[in-house]
Amino acid sequence: MKGRRLWMTVGALAVLGAAALVLLRGKGLRMRTVHRLRALLHHDEAIEEGTAGAFSNVIFLHHSVGRYLIEQGGVRERLSEAGYRFWDHDYNYIGITDPSGALTGYSYGVPDDNTNPDGLAALFAQPLHELPLNAFSGLMQHEVILFKSCFPVSNIRSDEQLEQYKQWYLAMREVMDDHPDHLFIVLTPPPLNPSATTPEAAARARAFADWLLSDEYLEGHPNVATFDLFGALAEDDPDSPEVNMLRADYRRDGEDSHPNETANREVGPRLADFIIRTAEAYREEVANGE
């Protein structure tokens, strides 16, 4: 298997190297090509360690909210202490951070850097290759895959938009069903600052989060789980005018919808513990042939 993978890597590198030369003669070497080459060169490190049913090789696809959650919430450190190898994928230009906390210098090339529901659905619709030739194949080098959209997604302006979100996540779930050797953890999108939303849009954001947590979405799909980031960050007092919006004690100054350090310090350990519990439970389920 290793020999076959080596020759596949060499072949893929040759093709991408030729493409790079063409780009150099024309528009210049694009960062996407550089990242793809680096991902191919490093893929063995990701695919060989923490695999074979251990479900301890974890990657988290996110943007800035996830970055602060990881850094300020001690997510990587907590998972490392429990024996997990935690990678995370930020914007493409930042790329992937490895389990030691070091930037790798490459990304998996998320199409258009789009982690909104439509972008995630497009990512999951990519063909799966043994090598990380696209973003989906890159994420699938890891056994536990977390992903989230950022807070603008919580500005759900109509019931029709809410239903479209659900359809995209159902399409993703169909793909997840095809890969029981992987565990997928969905994070509900974080809530918005009250200045950036309306009560109606916020209520739909809560409804979307609740749906992702529901039996309707999860029952019968044992390798799919949901962490309620929205619920962890949103005001839940039904009598508050800011219900379903970013909690006052979790806000930064002004109108910024990024949760503050207090929020990240409180929620980060909860996320790490959820990953550990969920991975352990699924590992046992797979081992028992359930």
PLM feature segments, named:
Residues 17-37:
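Membrane-interface motif at the C-terminal end of an N-terminal transmembrane signal
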Residues 192-290:
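Catalytic His-Asp segment of secreted/periplasmic serine-dependent ester chemistry enzymes
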Residues 67-68, 75-159:
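Conserved SGNH/GDSL esterase-like catalytic core that processes O-acyl groups on lipids
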Residues 1-16:
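N-terminal Sec-pathway targeting helices
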Residues 151-152, 175-208:
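Active-site segments of SGNH/GDSL-like serine hydrolases
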Residues 31-95:
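Serine-esterase "nucleophile elbow" of acetyl-processing enzymes
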Residues 122-131, 160-172, 201-214:
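Well-ordered, non-membrane alpha-helical segments in soluble/globular domains
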Residues 57-61, 85-90, 95, 143-149, ...:
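Structural recognition of the beta-strand scaffold that forms the well-ordered cores
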